[in-house]
């Protein structure tokens, strides 16, 4: 897959995003 970040070991963020408390957020 094209996931680069995993939130809490479960939730997968796309490459341009990062994991934050509220979920995946766009990585500037």
Curated annotation (Swiss-Prot):
Gene Ontology terms: cellular component: extracellular region
Organism of origin: Californiconus californicus
Which cysteine pairs are covalently linked by disulfides here? 3-13, 7-19, 12-24
Question: Domain annotation text?
Answer: The presence of a 'disulfide through disulfide knot' structurally defines this protein as a knottin.
Q: What is this protein called?
A: Conotoxin Cl6a
Q: Please provide the record's keywords in A-Z order.
A: Disulfide bond, Knottin, Neurotoxin, Secreted, Toxin
**Residues annotated as signal peptide:** none
Cellular compartments annotated: Secreted
UniProt superkingdom: Eukaryota
UniProt note on tissues of expression: Expressed by the venom duct.
In terms of one coarse class, where is the protein primarily found?
Answer: secreted
In its UniProt record, a GO molecular function of this protein is: toxin activity
């Amino acid at each position: 897959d094209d996931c680069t970040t995993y939130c809490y070991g479960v939730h997968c963020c796309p490459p341009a995003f990062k994991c934050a408390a509220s979920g995946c957020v766009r990585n500037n």
